Regions:
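Alpha-helix capping/helix-boundary segments
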Residues: 104-105
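Surface-exposed amphipathic alpha-helical tracts and adjacent flexible/coil segments at the periphery
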Residues: 1-26, 31-34, 38, 56-57, ...
Length: 345
């Protein structure tokens, strides 16, 4: 058994704006990850000003929670010029760690904020223990494993001394290794590695055969009349396998979704909070899992998959028939206050 298993795992939730930040903490997250207005790979989220980040750090710390700030772009020279002051400001805000993927960004962070812990982003595609060892020796204190890792690789990475392991348990997945896809840049001029991905992989694609002498007469190979979604990933959901996920030795269980709604954040965090607590008390069961899985299905989602945890064929991680998200429930309202049995919505 992995020796790190005895540590109470952290439930880490996304926060795309202030409302989602409060929602995540209220429903049981131990920590949140968020981004400033730049450098955070979610350019279309509301994100946070430095003053807001400082407030969030103080608020979270009062409740014994943590705040991690993403600075996980793949930087160019212009970015590097602005990063020293920005990272220094994040350190002064009280951030508990930076999530980084670029070696240059990491070097700057170590120079201007040497006491600020560095977490290696999943964008860096760390898939094995030797790579994790390399990044640890470079100054990283936590590895956010690539979503493509299998169980055995995660166990080996978690066993590495002086370096923690964080794994994703829920949320959207990419058809490529994170950060390695150029479809968005090619088709729209918006770079995924700058936080502007348009998710071109989820568009309706057509495969065709074209004869050299007759380029104006392509033969389309359609799955049906709507086309085929050959690169459309399902959503990760490890709810039914949460006990097994804990057996990897990961110290942090991460939920994807900084671009998702407050309803999504609250529902998913609440479900995994209850599931994780049940695992830690020995009361997690199929009936508990099934009930919480039904809660998760009330949020906007695509067909679920356990990803690569146990090794999966391509057709078990992709949805070839539709890229549309579904939900088994309807969002009604947010409760703003509760007093004397009356809710303000």
């Amino acid at each position: 058994m992995n020796k790190q298993k005895t540590r109470r795992p952290e439930l880490l939730a996304p926060a795309g704006n202030m409302e989602k930040f409060f929602t995540a903490l209220h429903f049981g997250a131990d920590a949140v990850y968020l981004a400033g207005k730049n450098f955070g790979l979610r350019a279309f989220a509301d994100n946070f000003t430095l003053d807001e980040i400082k407030f969030c750090c103080g608020y979270a710390h009062e409740k014994g929670k943590k705040v991690y700030v993403t600075v996980n772009i793949f930087a160019d020279g212009r970015d590097l010029e602005k990063l020293p002051d920005y990272i220094s400001a994040l350190d002064n805000c009280g951030a508990d760690a930076l999530i980084v993927s670029d070696a240059g960004v990491m070097q700057i962070a170590k120079s201007v904020a040497p006491r600020l812990p560095l977490h290696l982003s999943t964008q860096a595609n760390c898939t094995n223990a030797r790579a994790a060892e390399f990044w640890r020796d470079a100054g990283v204190s936590r590895i956010v494993a690539a979503r493509e890792c299998g169980f055995d690789d995660l166990v080996q990475m978690a066993a590495l001394k002086d370096c923690e392991l964080e794994i994703f348990v829920h949320g959207a997945m990419c058809m490529a290794y994170s950060g390695r896809c150029l479809l968005s840049s090619w088709l729209s001029g918006r770079g995924g590695n700058k936080g502007e991905c348009v998710q071109a992989c989820r568009w309706e694609w057509q495969v065709s055969l074209t004869e050299r002498e007759h380029p104006d007469k392509p033969l389309f190979l359609n799955e049906d009349e709507r086309g085929v979604y050959i690169m459309n990933s399902r959503d990760l959901c490890l709810m039914p396998y949460l006990n097994r996920a804990l057996e990897t030795g990961a110290v942090s269980l991460k939920i994807e979704g900084r671009m998702k709604s407050a309803h999504y954040v609250g529902t998913v965090v609440n479900a995994y909070r209850r599931a994780l607590d049940a695992c830690l008390t020995g009361s997690f069961s199929k009936s508990v899992s099934d009930g919480l899985l039904n809660e998760l299905k009330k949020t906007s989602h695509r067909a679920f998959t356990s990803g690569f945890l146990f090794g999966k064929d391509f057709d078990e991680t992709e949805n070839f028939f539709t890229s549309k998200a579904v939900a088994d429930g309807n969002f009604v309202a947010s409760v703003l206050d509760w007093s004397d049995g009356v809710a303000a919505v």
